């Protein structure tokens, strides 16, 4: 017996970027395949507080953006428990402060985010000339005063690509061009996701990657630094986007299907209505399963996406009937969220992974 799964969750990585970009665009943006969860709803509530009008008709989110120059006088931004939302918003908070004459903006959250050290986000802000203080260094709440003043900014992306994404979303709003140099970039697929979101909302920038042949412990082919050249004075334009299904969730079902199939419990599993050009890092699970000996096949889904992004949706089948899965080797530097499910997969493979 085979099993089919339709991943109802929208990718938080895709949705949070799209929601913030829609807020910065003056006019209506429509985000299809909207499936609310705490982190996505948190982003929606943030932009509502900035003056955006929000409506939902089932699975489509309608956002009437106010535009970057008309952001509300936000004195406090609440990011819930989302590390991504916090890091995306810290550079934007500095821009809001600058628009409001340098008035302080406080970023806070609740729950686990208050125990997370975000020192790299604070260091990046200070490198950009922003005054950022905290009751306890590196921990929320942050008090951010003044805008980004430096036109050449450099910091490490080793600990998080999310801070880089936050700067890439804010720098186009500045009056002058900025050069951002990111050393030791990590989670590069998520940077690609940010860049695609920016393109969809009319933002342009250039980038150049530099390589050192794998020195410093990096895998050959991984850039040692990326230099982004960001023109200033840009405006976000409204857009219609399809929010891709969440590959982080899909990875668990794909592994479960492969393992259960190899044990003869089921024939396999089919993940319905997935996108193979999503740029989500966790899509790599398909290549990993192939390397373990599982069969991964792709067939067109019976639905398509109205032309907001290239590529239609696919049904993806994973089977390993009557075969033991083989040990694998993978570098998860750029897809760290896969670590837990990869440990489960390794436990069901012959040999040492």
Protein language model annotation of sequence segments:
Residues 3-4, 8-353:
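Structural preference for solvent-exposed beta-strand-turn elements
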């Amino acid at each position: 017996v085979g099993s089919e799964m339709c991943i109802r969750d929208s990718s938080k990585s895709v949705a949070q970027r799209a929601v913030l970009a829609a807020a910065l665009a003056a006019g209506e943006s429509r985000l299809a395949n909207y499936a609310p969860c705490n982190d996505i709803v948190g982003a929606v509530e943030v932009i509502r507080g900035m003056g955006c009008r929000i409506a939902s008709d089932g699975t489509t989110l309608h956002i009437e953006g106010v535009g970057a120059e008309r952001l509300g006088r936000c004195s406090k931004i609440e990011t819930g428990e989302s590390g991504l939302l916090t890091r995306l918003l810290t550079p934007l908070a500095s821009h809001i402060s600058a628009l409001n004459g340098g008035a302080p903006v406080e970023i806070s959250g609740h729950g686990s985010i208050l125990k997370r050290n975000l020192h790299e986000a604070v260091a990046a802000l200070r490198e950009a000339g922003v005054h950022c203080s905290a009751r306890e260094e590196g921990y929320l709440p942050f008090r951010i005063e003044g805008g980004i003043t430096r036109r050449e900014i450099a910091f490490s992306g080793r600990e998080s690509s999310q801070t880089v994404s936050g700067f890439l979303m804010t720098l186009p709003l500045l009056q002058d061009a900025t050069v951002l140099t990111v050393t030791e970039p990590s989670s590069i697929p998520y940077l690609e996701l940010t860049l695609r979101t920016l393109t969809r909302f009319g933002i342009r920038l250039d980038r150049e990657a530099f390589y050192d042949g794998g020195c410093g412990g990096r895998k050959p082919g991984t850039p040692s630094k990326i230099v982004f050249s960001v023109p200033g004075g840009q405006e976000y334009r409204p857009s219609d986007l399809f929010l891709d299904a969440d590959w982080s969730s899909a990875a668990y079902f794909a592994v479960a299907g492969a393992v259960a199939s190899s044990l003869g419990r089921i024939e396999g599993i089919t993940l319905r209505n997935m996108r193979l050009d999503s740029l989500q890092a966790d899509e790599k699970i398909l290549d990993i399963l192939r390397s373990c000996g599982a069969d991964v096949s792709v067939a067109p889904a019976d639905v398509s996406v109205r032309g907001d992004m290239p590529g239609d949706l696919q049904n993806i089948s994973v089977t390993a009937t009557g075969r033991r899965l083989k040990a694998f080797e993978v570098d998860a530097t750029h897809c760290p969220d896969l670590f837990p499910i990869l440990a489960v997969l390794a436990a069901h493979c012959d040999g040492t992974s």
